[in-house]
């Protein structure tokens, strides 16, 4: 297989992959199911609870200091009549987050270090009370028999409605409390750490009544998905949007919003896992205690898609207490910060691919890219450095590919003679051809195998550049001030066309039929138009990769005793 056919295969595979993704989005939009209401369940005292306690994993009640008397009589959570009326909204601000919450639900969440636009000042709002597309995180308690806090039940223990992480402090702690009837109270503590998007939420149930208290905690994420503008030039539209979850037994799984209830409501008991809602560059997740089991549920509540953890359930004896803790992640898919959370499988939210092998390749490529960035301090130069390293690593394959093509070209006259000799007898022609290949030790697939080996790397790198939030709004130099936006002056796409055209002229084309020749003439223009509206980081990759490929092509031609000028003249005929 000559260089031209290899190039054509690679080019058309790329076009086919992009067209397939575009067709898949259009088909999904046309066939999107109408949201349905969640299934009926036994009533619970909490309006947001959706399952009977019998279906929820239990946890052992944990006594304080070993005896009922250990619960201090002067605690700030001394039993009082149940609180009535809606609690005022509280604002918590750290160096990276601004949260609006009511003690039970996080209603708004702004990511202070991520502006919505390159030149804007408005931060990305991940959780929102927007009437058209609400998106919030809720943690509450439910019970079939015992009193529990409802909407507005939690109250801040400290006066005021605004709490901010002060300079010199690394931790912001804001406690809330619900005082129920008959001496039962739940104390909830929100903890924000400097530089972290993980919010710790710890609940302690204290029972000072004379009867056992029964209930379970639930934690959920719910949103009305945003309808994204479709198009192969819009990475948001073909990045994964939906629910993901992880269990030590089953590993990482996911379900897109458009297919949310196709496989049922999940209803799986998991210990040591997590659940998340993903979108391009950002996500939210509930990460419960590793040693406490929860029932994982996917559901729809009208237009809302819901991912929920139910449990553990507690039976708290009189004079005893029980506690449970979880982390709520509200933030970007920053690989360095995800690693600090020490949560198994959480790195998969950076969705390089749903296939494990491609995800592993993508993680490896990003590891190299991030280390290059630590030295070069610029993501554009890091992309160029990565392409250079890949080209060096794949040079033996490129050399083998060209060597195979050169050998095939030398035997083109003999193949033409065989074709003339056997005429329309294809069986004899193929038999004679295979005997010639065997005698001369020619591998007809020698030019194709290197391509097949390189393709997973190239596709994985594409998703690394699209999915990595680290590159979001990152500049390169001069006119490229955002590697995730298109080239404003189309300089890189034009360079890409020129490099592809020059590569085409340097590619020997013995025996090419007229149809292939016409396809080759239009290929640089097709790719140029396609790349014109792609993110500049991707086009930069193609320009550098193509430029290095052109230099390698020139070098290979001279190494095998051929003259570039003769090839150019032959292709001009």
UniProtKB/Swiss-Prot annotation:
Membrane-crossing segments per the record: 6-26, 355-375, 379-399, 446-466, 488-508, 524-544
Keywords associated with the record: Cell inner membrane, Cell membrane, Chaperone, Membrane, Protein transport, Transmembrane, Transmembrane helix, Transport
Membrane-protein topology: Multi-pass membrane protein
Any one GO CC term of the record: plasma membrane
Biological process according to GO: protein insertion into membrane; protein transport
InterPro entries given in the database record: Membr_insert_YidC, Membr_insert_YidC_N, YidC/ALB3/OXA1/COX18, YidC/Oxa/ALB_C, YidC_ALB_C, YidC_periplasmic_sf
CDD domains in the record: 5TM_YidC_Alb3, EcYidC-like_peri
Family recorded in the similarity comment: Belongs to the OXA1/ALB3/YidC family. Type 1 subfamily.
Subunit structure: Interacts with the Sec translocase complex via SecD. Specifically interacts with transmembrane segments of nascent integral membrane proteins during membrane integration.
Function: Required for the insertion and/or proper folding and/or complex formation of integral membrane proteins into the membrane. Involved in integration of membrane proteins that insert both dependently and independently of the Sec translocase complex, as well as at least some lipoproteins. Aids folding of multispanning membrane proteins.
Protein name: Membrane protein insertase YidC
Source organism per UniProt: Xanthomonas campestris pv. campestris (strain ATCC 33913 / DSM 3586 / NCPPB 528 / LMG 568 / P 25)
Gene from which the chain derives: yidC
């Amino acid at each position: 297989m000559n260089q031209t056919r290899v190039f054509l295969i690679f080019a058309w595979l790329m076009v086919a992959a992009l067209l397939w993704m575009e067709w898949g989005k259009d088909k999904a939009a046309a066939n999107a199911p109408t949201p349905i209401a969640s299934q009926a369940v036994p009533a619970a005292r909490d309006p947001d609870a959706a399952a009977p306690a019998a279906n929820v994993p239990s946890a052992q009640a944990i006594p304080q200091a070993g005896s009922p008397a250990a619960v201090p009589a002067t605690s700030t959570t001394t039993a009082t009549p149940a609180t009535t009326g809606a609690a005022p909204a509280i604002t918590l601000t750290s160096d990276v987050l601004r949260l609006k919450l009511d003690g039970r639900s996080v209603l708004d969440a702004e990511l202070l270090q991520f502006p919505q636009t390159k030149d804007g000042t408005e931060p990305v709002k991940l959780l929102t009370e927007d009437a058209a597309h609400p998106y919030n995180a809720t943690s509450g308690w439910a019970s079939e028999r015992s009193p529990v806090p409802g909407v507005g039940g939690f109250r801040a223990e400290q006066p005021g409605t605004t709490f901010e992480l002060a300079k010199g402090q690394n931790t912001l702690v804001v406690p809330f409390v619900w005082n129920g009837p008959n001496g039962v109270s739940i104390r909830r503590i929100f903890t924000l750490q400097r530089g972290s998007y993980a919010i710790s939420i710890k609940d302690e149930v204290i029972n000072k009544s004379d009867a056992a208290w029964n209930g379970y905690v639930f934690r959920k994420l719910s949103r009305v998905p945003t309808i994204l503008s479709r198009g192969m030039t819009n990475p948001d539209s073909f990045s994964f949007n939906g629910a993901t979850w992880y269990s030590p037994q089953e590993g990482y799984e996911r379900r897109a919003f458009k297919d949310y209830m196709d496989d049922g409501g999940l209803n799986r008991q998991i210990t040591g896992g997590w659940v998340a809602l993903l979108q391009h560059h950002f996500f939210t997740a509930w990460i419960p205690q590793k040693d406490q089991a929860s029932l994982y549920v996917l559901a729809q509540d009208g237009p809302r898609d819901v991912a929920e953890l139910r449990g553990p359930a507690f039976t708290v004896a009189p004079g005893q207490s029980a506690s449970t803790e979880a982390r709520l992640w509200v933030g970007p898919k920053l690989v360095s910060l995800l690693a600090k959370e020490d949560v198994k499988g959480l790195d998969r939210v950076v969705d390089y691919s749903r296939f494990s092998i491609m995800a592993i390749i993508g993680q490896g490529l990003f590891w190299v890219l991030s280390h290059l960035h630590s030295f070069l301090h610029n993501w554009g130069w890091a992309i160029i450095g990565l392409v250079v390293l890949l080209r060096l690593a794949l040079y033996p394959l490129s050399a083998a590919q060209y060597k195979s093509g050169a050998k095939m070209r030398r035997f083109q006259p003999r193949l033409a003679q065989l074709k003339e000799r056997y005429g329309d007898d294809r069986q004899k022609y193929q038999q004679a051809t295979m005997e010639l290949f065997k005698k001369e030790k020619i591998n007809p697939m020698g030019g194709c195998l290197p391509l097949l080996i390189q393709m997973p790397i190239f596709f994985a790198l594409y998703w690394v550049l699209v999915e990595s939030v680290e590159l979001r709004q990152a500049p390169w130099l001069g006119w490229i001030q955002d590697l995730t936006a298109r080239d404003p002056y189309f300089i890189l796409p034009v360079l890409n066309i020129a490099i592809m055209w020059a590569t085409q002229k340097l590619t020997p084309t013995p025996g090419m039929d007229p149809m292939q020749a016409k396809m080759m003439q239009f290929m640089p223009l097709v790719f140029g138009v396609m790349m014109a509206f792609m993110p500049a980081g991707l086009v930069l990759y193609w320009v550098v990769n193509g430029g290095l490929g052109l230099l390698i092509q020139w070098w290979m031609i001279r190494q095998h005793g051929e003259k570039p000028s003769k090839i150019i003249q032959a292709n001009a005929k």
